[in-house]
């Protein structure tokens, strides 16, 4: 019953926003903006408090919460499982529904691996919970961020798992509501020197924004000076030019001296961009992600922004999640799954999601390591995605192992900073004709314009140090050395545009690092500069 007052407030807020927009030129109605902000924030705080209480109860009674989630799945199934509908016994459920994999063979020519068929409607409550709790956590850590005119989003996508129709403009977010022009979003942000928070859908999208700002900075400064759009701001345009002339390091704080935090949605393949942004453009700023978006719409919640980046709570409510233990060096098909309360600290597990519509238990491929607990629920760090494994001779180089080896190799390239990378097995590009199969590795760097042969060889050496199996195959000549290519600026932006155009692509938010389709690999191959 308490939900109805909140819904009434939400219905009133768009009307207030419209009235504010229509009468924004009338100084006599400036009080309306303050009223609108107070009403919006009061509704948000109330809703977040309600969601937090629900989360506390569910994490204190994990087994009961997961039983309810399982019952929710069984009742919503679109195919008959009569024996299951009458029982939520976990053993019966597991015996009737064997584990399946998100197939790597059912790929469309125009995209990456399709995700499990989880309904957005089914996951709506989980995404709403992540958004409300994330906003509350952000406000607690940075109280001034959600004040009027202190936040700007610079990408079309939002970092909030379920962007609400009212908080952005109502809570004073900079920019025109509903704009579909990324350039307009960036211009609105650049015109506002008092920002406290910068939002972007994901870290890789924000990386593209800053790279584009370096390229198009003079054009953007000219638009600000000319008042296109808005009033002419010649002094602000001069500040933009001066900030860009000093290079990328610390650029965000030069543009917005009061900036405190960067808000992006965490997902697979984003850590590299976060590191690059933190070392260069966003140096000195905190990063906050309200959630981790795993495969199939599963969300890990970030309830404590002050903790180390990358720790997330796996909530026990719908959708129904199980954990499949990962054995070192193998993935046992016959291993039994565990419930959330049975997870052990220090162990690694693959997430298993039950799709409500098809009643399918699907192995998502997302591997987590349990690092702590919140009440009775595991707090995890997402380690890797099994579908991002490289294997040309059965060597199985995992995403985490490859990223670590690449990081060590780049660390030996004097002056180089890794911005982006993508991998392709040689068979995709038919580049192993007359030679052993190998990896084609494409990198985007800052601080290094050419790769020497010595630089290229270091990645292969690091891979051999990291994987005895790979080293053995290299020794016998069964696998050729990894070939490293430097791509020009804009290569990965073009790749992301191609990915975003694919309906079955996981991007955004997840960024694939192993490309399985020729046309995607060619986005990088065609832009090699060294």
UniProtKB/Swiss-Prot annotation:
Q: Which UniProt keywords apply?
A: Endoplasmic reticulum, Glycoprotein, Methylation, Nucleus, Signal
- InterPro entries noted in UniProt: GH3, GH3_C, GH3_M, GH3_N
Identify the stretch annotated as signal peptide in this record: 1-17
Q: Could you tell me one molecular function GO term of this UniProt entry? A: acid-amino acid ligase activity
Q: Which GO terms describe its cellular component?
A: cytoplasm; endoplasmic reticulum; extracellular region; membrane; nuclear envelope; secretory granule lumen; specific granule lumen
Instruction: Tell me which residues bear N5-methylglutamine.
Output: 489
**Is Membrane there in the keyword field?**
no
Q: So where does this one cross the membrane?
A: none
Positions of the region Disordered? 99-122
Subcellular location field: Endoplasmic reticulum; Nucleus envelope
Q: Which family does it belong to?
A: Belongs to the GH3 family.
Its recorded name reads: GH3 domain-containing protein
The record lists the organism as: Homo sapiens (Human)
Its taxonomic placement starts with: Eukaryota, Metazoa, Chordata, Craniata, Vertebrata
Instruction: Quote the gene name from the UniProt entry.
Output: GHDC
